[in-house]
């Protein structure tokens, strides 16, 4: 029960943070959270993830909606786009250094709250 209370307190603290923070942005919808996990998974496993691949992998999200979320995440500085060397039309999506740190801190805190 103690860990459940700690998890609740952690969640409430996350939600109190600025509306411009990544904590708020990626919890707006399941699609936002799923996108964060897909991008960070590719980053952690040192895999390339193109914008088109990301749009395809997001379930129950239209391509225009996916594009809006990606653009907003880039505008807020959580992700950035990098053109590939082989095909200048293709762009890979990567997390910013500051977002990687926020994500790592988030994961460490969650691990410490094991129920």
Question: What is each PLM-predicted segment?
Answer:
Residues 45-57:
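Short acidic, hydrophobic short linear motifs in intrinsically disordered regions
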């Amino acid at each position: 029960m103690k860990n459940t209370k700690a998890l609740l307190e952690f969640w409430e603290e996350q939600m109190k943070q600025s509306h411009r923070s990544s904590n708020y942005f990626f919890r707006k919808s399941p699609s936002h959270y799923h996108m964060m996990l897909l991008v960070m998974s590719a980053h952690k496993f040192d895999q390339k993830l193109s914008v088109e691949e990301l749009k395809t992998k997001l379930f129950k999200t239209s391509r225009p909606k996916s594009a809006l979320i990606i653009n907003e995440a880039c505008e807020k500085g959580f992700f950035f786009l990098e053109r590939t060397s082989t095909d200048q039309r293709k762009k890979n999506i990567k997390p910013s250094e500051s977002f990687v740190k926020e994500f790592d801190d988030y994961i460490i805190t969650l691990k410490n709250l094991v129920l």
